[in-house]
């Protein structure tokens, strides 16, 4: 049995924050903890995110996503415009909820992946596409 836990790890060089929640933990516990940990980062709006939910066996509901969106907005205040969030899950409901979740986070681009490797590859490609030098 997995010990329920929430973690946020940060790579300051790649500017990627990885959020993981593991075990039978529900959204009413996950969301406040994620917001506390993410909010403690210096300039958190400068990070792209990977949300790794592969070992999550609890439940999150639409109201949890809405609470996360409100807290996220309070922390980032729209300064995360153009950032990316890769969600890693094999739960079909996560993919089905993506259009609703995307509307809750209008400044970020969200996508769902089966593996962390696929999520990282998407982030690298998306970043390369948006960081191309402009012609003056």
Residue ranges and their predicted role:
Residues 1-136:
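Amphipathic, Lys/Arg-enriched alpha-helical "gate/interface" segment within cytosolic domains
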């Amino acid at each position: 049995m997995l010990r329920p836990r929430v973690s946020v790890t940060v790579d300051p060089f790649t500017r990627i924050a990885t959020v993981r929640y593991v075990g039978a933990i529900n959204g009413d516990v996950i969301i406040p903890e994620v917001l506390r940990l993410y909010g403690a980062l210096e300039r958190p709006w400068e990070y792209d995110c990977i949300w790794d939910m592969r070992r999550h066996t609890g439940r999150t509901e639409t109201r949890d996503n809405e609470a996360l969106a409100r807290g996220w907005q309070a922390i980032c205040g729209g300064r995360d415009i153009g950032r990316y969030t890769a969600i890693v899950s094999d739960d079909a409901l996560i993919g089905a909820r993506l259009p609703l979740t995307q509307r809750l986070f209008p400044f970020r681009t969200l996508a769902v992946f089966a593996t962390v490797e696929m999520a990282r590859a998407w982030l690298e490609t998306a970043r390369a596409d948006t960081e191309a030098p402009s012609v003056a």
